[in-house]
């Protein structure tokens, strides 16, 4: 399974929803980068994604986007192939 990295904050309901979905799909470990604790990480996230909002999710080297994009990818059947190593 691909590595999953998520930029998040503690109180973000979309972050919680995204983590729950990923765990339901078999992801055992999510590298959780808390941008509320480290302003440098928020700046890094914005430089990588061009976005200010959380969550920002990476599966392997693929930037999935936020929670809505993750859910949409799952609904169209494209999340599991990406988690299992397909290019996204």
Where are the regions a protein language model picked out?
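Local sequence-structure signature of Cys/Sec-based thiol-disulfide redox active-site neighborhoods
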Residues: 1-29
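Positively charged, proline/Ser/Thr-rich regional signature most characteristic
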Residues: 24, 37, 69-70
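Conserved catalytic core of Hanks-type protein kinase domains
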Residues: 24, 48, 73
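Alpha-helix termination/capping residues and helix-transition junctions
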Residues: 24-27, 51, 64
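Thiol-based oxidoreductase modules, predominantly thioredoxin-like and allied folds used
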Residues: 28-42
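Thiol/disulfide oxidoreductase modules built on the thioredoxin-like
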Residues: 47-53
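Non-catalytic, surface beta->alpha helical segment in thiol-disulfide oxidoreductase systems
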Residues: 59-86
């Amino acid at each position: 399974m691909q590595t999953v990295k998520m930029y998040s904050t503690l109180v973000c309901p979309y972050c919680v929803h995204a983590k729950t979905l990923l765990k339901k799909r078999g992801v055992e470990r999510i590298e959780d980068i808390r941008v509320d604790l480290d302003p440098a990480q928020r700046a890094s996230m914005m430089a990588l994604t061009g976005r200010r909002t959380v969550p920002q999710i990476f599966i392997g080297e693929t930037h999935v986007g936020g929670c809505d994009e993750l859910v949409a990818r799952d609904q169209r059947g494209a999340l599991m192939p990406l988690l299992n190593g397909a290019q996204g």
